[in-house]
Amino acid sequence: MKRVIILMMDSFGIGGAADAAKFGDEGANTLASVAKLNNGLKIPNLISLGLVKAAEASAGVKIETGPQPPAQVNIPSKYGFMREQSHGKDTLSGHWEMAGVPVLFDWGYFKPGYPSFPKELIEQICKEAGIDKILGNKAASGTEILEELGEEHIKTGKPICYTSADSVFQIAAHEKHFGLERLYTICEIAFKYLKPYKIARVIARPFEGERKGEFKRTKNRHDYAVKPPAPTVLDFLKENGGNVISIGKINDIYAKQGITKAVKASGLEELWNTTIEETKNASGNSIIFTNFVDFDMVWGHRRDFKGYAGGLEYFDSRLPELANILQEGDLVFITADHGCDPSYKGTDHTRENVPAIMFGKNVKNGFIGGRETYSDLGQTVAEYLGITKLNNGTSFL
């Protein structure tokens, strides 16, 4: 019975991208920065699986993790790093590429300064949604714009619309005063009118709180993403009668394509609990695919290196629990979709290589080197599960 578990650590880059300078990200290294700024990291299980060796090979710098307690995961692993072929450093590009479909075209983007959005676009959205005007209309940090405009939003009922360095149109609205379903409806309207602009995602950002200093996002975020331009490894497994269990953001990221069961979860603990539970219950010929979004959304973008370190140490502490329930035919992958170095300027993603770690009871230990595309992971999954060979990537099985 063969199963694949993919642990996607959103934004967990390990530096060394050859084209980082092109993105203004020269020297960015999420893991190295978090380790250095916290004077070490207690991640013995990730280290035993080859993370630090992979990271040092990726960027050519020493990762200062410091003394470690004994590892509790004792299982064979292959480790290395993957370079991104896709033109962007965004969530969709990274996820699609690791599933065999690199994004070899350019997304549309909005200018950062006010007004970010074309007048006719906003008029179309407002008219169909039955609203007068919007707030924001610029590139901004999601938490900062709530502090700036949250009270005005509650007072006026105008949704807060903003963008970032990614190909996104984000709409923040109060879950109680504005209404969650109303927010989702406006996002669906915006998604329809954004198609000509080649924008990758519309993101609903519900929040709560009554005044400045109290506003915080809720767990009811929803992403409206365009569909991958070609079938992914998830589609091929589904077509072959297999199971694809998405946990967290995965269902939204792939626009529900190739998913047979979508499980909602948020927060590192709940995402881990759900992953463990689904691994216990999943049948053979399955992919269990979890996006651990907090590394990106809660710590990376907010440049919170202490929070990032705490998240890594917690993630590491749950690995033995997963390893202990693995069956003979299980393969686990640990990877990421891009970087988000919390020591770096700005608040955006950083172009970095990502880990490629594979472990399981029947894996042969070894270094797989630097892979030329994230699609090598998808090709490895396809070969292991005996499904259609992908058009991109080389297996490291």
From Swiss-Prot:
What detail does the entry give on cofactor binding?
Answer: Binds 2 manganese ions.
Q: Which keywords annotate this record? A: Cytoplasm, Isomerase, Manganese, Metal-binding
Which pathway does UniProt place it in?
Carbohydrate degradation; 2-deoxy-D-ribose 1-phosphate degradation; D-glyceraldehyde 3-phosphate and acetaldehyde from 2-deoxy-alpha-D-ribose 1-phosphate: step 1/2
Q: Which InterPro entries match?
A: Alkaline_phosphatase_core_sf, DeoB, Metalloenzyme, Phosphopentomutase_DeoB_cap_sf
Q: Which GO terms describe its biological process?
A: 2-deoxyribose 1-phosphate catabolic process; 5-phosphoribose 1-diphosphate biosynthetic process; metabolic compound salvage; nucleotide metabolic process
Q: Which Pfam families match?
A: Metalloenzyme
| Source domain of life | Bacteria
Q: What function is annotated for this protein?
A: Isomerase that catalyzes the conversion of deoxy-ribose 1-phosphate (dRib-1-P) and ribose 1-phosphate (Rib-1-P) to deoxy-ribose 5-phosphate (dRib-5-P) and ribose 5-phosphate (Rib-5-P), respectively.
Catalytic activity of the protein: 2-deoxy-alpha-D-ribose 1-phosphate = 2-deoxy-D-ribose 5-phosphate; alpha-D-ribose 1-phosphate = D-ribose 5-phosphate
Q: Where does Mn(2+) 1 bind?
A: 10, 337-338
KW Endoplasmic reticulum (keyword) present = no
User: Which cofactors must be present for this protein to function?
Assistant: Mn(2+)
Q: Chief subcellular site?
A: cytoplasm
Its lineage reads: Bacteria, Pseudomonadati, Elusimicrobiota, Elusimicrobia, Elusimicrobiales
| Name the UniProt record assigns to this protein | Phosphopentomutase
Q: Where in the cell is it found?
A: Cytoplasm
Is-annotated flag, keyword Oxidoreductase? no
Query: Binding positions for Mn(2+) 2?
Result: 296, 301, 349
